[in-house]
Amino acid sequence: MEAILKATLEVPVWCSFRIPTAVNVHTTYPVPPITTIFGLLSAAMGWSSDDHSNMDKLDIGILLIKPGERIEGYNKIIKWDRRDKQMRTLVMRHKLIQPVYQIAVKGEQGLIEHIAKALDNPYFPLCLGESDDVVEVKEVEVFPIKKTMTQEIDSILPQELGRPVNKVELFYLPIGFLAEERGNRRTWSGVKYQGYYIASKMQLEEPIEAYLLGEKRVVL
């Protein structure tokens, strides 16, 4: 039997989810990618940071509750600067001030209940984005599986599942890790991306199947 967990993630200061194609300007996704949420769950559960095998057991959805204010700041990073032959350089980094998200995580009921307890009492300190981007996890609930057909959803939407008619953003988010089997070993060789429509609410051209979590309609 499966169940779905819903939790609220409040960022008290700021956070940033770097888009990897940027170089001198580190732009940010408007929501934490699926891989970032899995990292949060791994920290709560005490899973090894290089063990991604549990991703196959979970389906993850993200709800944008409050986008936060986007600002630009400068950060010094350690990198060889040829101009003055020092190990430093400045990059412009976008940050999101006090955004609020919700996550939905579906899986086997026992595992979901274990994750829910871990989010309330995490094994490691929790962050969202960079290691010093503090996050507060609130309102952790577990729901039974309940589906509905709807033209209005409250979560981000995989690009291939529907077409929004209201204003949205489209981003290609990291959703998992590519692995290669080498004998008895599995090595992680890259990152898998998927297109997502992103908005706080979406009105769609056609009804699609979604999960009911209280009043929220979520696509995983």
Model-identified regions with their sequence ranges:
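Extracellular structured ligand-interaction cores
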Residues: 4, 57-59, 98-100
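Internal, well-folded beta-alpha domain core
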Residues: 67-220
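N-terminal, Lys/Arg- and Ser/Thr-rich interaction peptides
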Residues: 1-23
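Beta-strand secondary-structure signal
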Residues: 6-8, 61, 102-104
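Primarily extracytoplasmic ectodomains and periplasmic/lumenal surface modules that are beta-strand-rich
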Residues: 13-16, 47-48, 111-112
